[in-house]
Structures are given as C-alpha cells and as structure tokens.
C-alpha cells in the first residue's frame, strides 16, 4: 500500500511539472544580477498574459533563455542615444546597470510590437542576446513566466 502511495505521488508530481510548472537552468549571464549563471528558475506554464517586467523562459536557437518583457502588443519600442524608449518615454530602471544600445546587425528601430508578441531584453544589456538581435518573441514560443529563482552557487 505504501508503494502505491509513493507511485501516485510520483505520477502527480510528474504531471504537475510536465503541464503546469517547469524548471530551467541558466547557462549565461544575460539576466545578471537578478538571475545568475547556473541558477535554477521555476516557471509557470499556464499564464500567457505577459506584462512589462515579467521574466519569461523561452527556447531560441535550441537554447533555453530568459529575458525580461519590456513591451507588449501595440507598444512602440525605440533605442536612441537616450536609451530605451517605450511609447516615447525613456525607461529608467534601478536594476539595469548598463546602457541599452542597438546591435549593429540587429533589429531595426523604431518598431511596433505585433499582436501575440512581446519585446524582451536581458538585464545585463551589454552581453544579453535578446529582442535587439532576433526581434519580437511570439507568445506561443514562450515556455512560461518565471516565479522563483533557486541559487545553486556552491552546491
């Protein structure tokens, strides 16, 4: 009877982590300092209503990546000498320590985020691979919204 309970718990946990939640490990420093290299991120798969500030987990070029949503459908995004502008307003964040600049062979600005898309940037703007390179993300390509970070340094 105990074995049956254990098997049931394992099956329930498998279903929960297959369809409701997911865990991803970071492999870069694009989201530093919020998420550091080798941290584990618990994400929620079912919420597809993203807002500016959400950290999302997605797959791009066969790599699991994480970035912060900075613009949603209908928003106009521009990167100028003044920095990141959303709908004509300069965006300033206490958690971003470097300037937001365009990449030479990246996305053309200004752009308007399309329906069913979001524009994402890594917090570590100087090294992040984000929408400045590959454009807006389709919401269907996003695995989920980060809800917790588990630090693994020293483990």
What are these regions, as identified by a protein language model?
Residues 30-31, 46, 67, 81, ...:
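Short, conserved secondary-structure segments in the cores of folded domains
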Residues 38-39, 54, 75, 117, ...:
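Structural motif
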Residues 1-65, 137-155:
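Protein maturation boundaries and topogenic segments
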Residues 87-105:
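PP2C/PPM family metal-dependent serine/threonine protein phosphatase catalytic domain
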Residues 105-155:
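Beta-strand-rich cores of mature extracytoplasmic or soluble domains
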């Amino acid at each position: 009877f105990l074995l049956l309970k254990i098997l049931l718990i394992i099956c329930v946990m498998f279903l929960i982590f297959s369809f409701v939640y997911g865990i991803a490990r970071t492999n870069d420093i694009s989201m530093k300092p919020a998420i550091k290299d080798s941290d584990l991120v618990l994400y929620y798969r079912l919420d597809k209503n993203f807002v500016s500030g959400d950290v999302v987990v997605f797959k791009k070029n066969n790599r699991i990546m994480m970035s912060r949503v900075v613009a949603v459908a209908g928003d106009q995004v521009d990167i100028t000498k003044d920095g990141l502008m959303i709908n004509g307003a300069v965006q300033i964040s206490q958690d971003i320590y470097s300037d937001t600049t365009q990449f030479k062979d990246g996305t053309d600005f200004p752009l308007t985020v399309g329906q069913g898309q979001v524009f994402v940037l890594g917090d570590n703007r100087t090294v992040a691979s984000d929408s400045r390179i590959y454009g807006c993300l389709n919401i269907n390509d996003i695995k989920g919204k980060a809800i917790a970070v588990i630090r693994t340094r020293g483990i």
